[in-house]
């Protein structure tokens, strides 16, 4: 399972 943090807008 690969977790990718969402980029801050």
Curated annotation (Swiss-Prot):
Assigned keywords, A-Z: Amidation, Neuropeptide, Pyrrolidone carboxylic acid, Secreted
Localization: Secreted
GO process terms (BP): neuropeptide signaling pathway
Keyword match Secreted: yes
Record GO cellular component, one term: extracellular region
Positions carrying Pyrrolidone carboxylic acid: 1
Keyword match Secreted: yes
Residues where Leucine amide is found: 9
Stretches assigned to coiled coil: none
Primary role: Mediates visceral muscle contractile activity (myotropic activity).
Family: Belongs to the periviscerokinin family.
Name of the protein: Periviscerokinin-1
Species this protein is from: Polyspilota aeruginosa (Madagascan marbled praying mantis)
